[in-house]
Curated annotation (Swiss-Prot):
SMART domains: RING. Residues 374-419 are annotated as: Disordered. Residues 35-197 are extracellular. The lineage of its organism: Eukaryota, Metazoa, Chordata, Craniata, Vertebrata. It comes from Danio rerio. It is found in: Membrane. This is RING finger protein 150. It is a single-pass type I membrane protein. The gene is rnf150. SUPFAM superfamilies: PA domain (SSF52025), RING/U-box (SSF57850).
Length: 419
């Protein structure tokens, strides 16, 4: 159950990240499709005769901007502005434009006092072929905007900056004939992010972070429980090892024992030979070691240093906790939460084992089958009788046997013994 929950959480977190990334990407693409403004610049080419030098002057700049509903095409003609000095805004439908040309002409109008639609309609009513409105009152003198004039889409209408418009007005007030040629400039696409989309993306991101945070909290809680259960298991195993050690045999080496001979094996822990009056511990596998050397080893490892026999299994104290202790350190990473639940379930079983029970049929529920293959040694095979130790000890030596470290009957050594 824990394994499936962990895998589901991991899959959910990964899927949430991927879906959120794809969603944000598609949402950004939606911005470019739905939230955008397309507008065109206009090249403005003016030609006039300088009255002082009689030279023809031509200026061409990309300073214009087509209106939102304007025809996107070129236009040419003579500039004309409202005749009344007080009505340069062309808000009066009856206002005239001067000078009037016989051919095509373009109206030059100042921004303000009425809508762009009204200005353009009044100029078109006087047969203007195009309308040029120059910006007035903007914080940026060179700013132009895309004029909205819905309903009038059959005429060319552009906006130019205020300085350029003032320049043209001054030329016309000096009675200079100005010819203008308007051509299409650069196409521009301006993208906007809608407020609704920003809120939606923000909410999606918050939900994503909450899911990820919840998964992280769950994951680290599982790891914390696993670490605590493993620590408790180690402490219980240590207590069980101490109880098992108290049931192992202890003897004192005497002069003439075969352990003191030069060809006898040394202690595998300290790599030193046995001397008279040394106290040794005899394990169920019949290997013996210095008591002070092997006891700390058994508390930590619970196995024979030579043959790796498990003393808890040999004495019938094996449990599911011991089997879990033999798992590799990365077992939790390999199987998710199975090890955690198994160790938690094993606490009650271990408590009964440490209390002194030697039930070889102890239940091993929740553990992998591979850990249940090795059965503990039978109590009948344990070397607890002195007669079984005769092949080890010398026939002429005085041997003291004990069955518990707390009930030792060891003679007081006269030499400097080991341990």
């Amino acid at each position: 159950m824990a394994l499936s929950v962990i895998q589901a959480c991991r899959s959910l977190a990964l899927s949430t990240w991927l879906l959120s990334f794809c969603f944000v990407h598609l949402l950004c693409l939606d911005f470019t499709v739905a939230e955008k403004e397309e507008w065109y610049t206009a090249f403005v080419n003016i030609t006039y005769v300088d009255p002082d030098t009689a030279e023809v002057r031509t200026e061409k700049t990309e300073c214009g901007r087509y209106g939102e509903h304007s025809l996107k095409r070129e236009a040419r003609g003579v500039l004309a502005m409202p005749a009344a000095p007080h009505d340069r805004h062309a808000c009066d439908p009856s206002g005239r434009f001067t000078p009037r040309a016989h051919g095509a002409w373009i109206a030059l109008i100042s921004r303000g006092n009425c809508t762009y639609k009204d200005k353009i309609r009044h100029a078109v009513g006087h047969n203007a072929s195009a309308v040029v409105i120059f910006n007035v009152g903007s914080s940026n003198p060179n700013e132009t905007i895309t004029m909205p004039h819905q309903g009038i889409s059959d005429v060319v209408a552009i906006m130019i900056p205020e300085p350029k418009g003032r320049e043209l007005v001054l030329l016309m007030e000096r009675n200079i004939t100005v010819h203008m040629h308007i051509t299409i400039g650069t196409r521009n696409l301006q993208k906007y992010v809608s407020r609704t989309s920003v809120v939606f993306v923000s909410i999606s991101f918050i939900i994503l972070m909450i899911i990820s945070l919840a998964w992280l909290v769950f994951y680290y809680i599982q790891r914390f429980r696993y670490a605590n259960a493993r620590d408790r298991n180690q402490r219980r195993l240590g207590d069980a090892a101490k109880k098992a050690i108290s049931q192992l045999q202890v003897r004192t080496i005497r002069k003439g024992d075969q352990e003191t001979e030069s060809d006898f094996d040394n202690c595998a822990v300290c790599i030193e030979g046995y001397k008279p009056n040394d106290v040794v511990r005899i394990l169920p596998c019949r290997h013996l070691f210095h008591k002070c050397c092997v006891d700390p080893w058994l508390v930590d490892h619970r196995t024979c240093p030579m043959c790796k026999m498990n003393i808890l299994k040999a004495l019938g104290l094996t449990s599911s906790a011991e089997c879990l202790n033999e798992l590799p350190l990365d077992y939790e990473l390999a199987v998710g939460g199975v090890a955690l639940n198994a160790m938690v379930m094993s606490d009650d079983v271990m408590a009964g084992d440490v209390g002194g029970a030697r039930d070889p049929g102890v239940r091993m529920g929740g553990l992998p089958q591979v850990l249940l293959d090795s059965e503990p040694l039978s109590q009948d095979t344990m070397p607890t009788e002195q007669s079984e130790l005769q092949p080890i000890a010398s026939g002429s030596s005085d041997v003291s046997l004990t069955t518990g470290a707390g009930h030792s009957d060891i003679d007081t050594p006269t030499d400097d013994p080991k341990c």
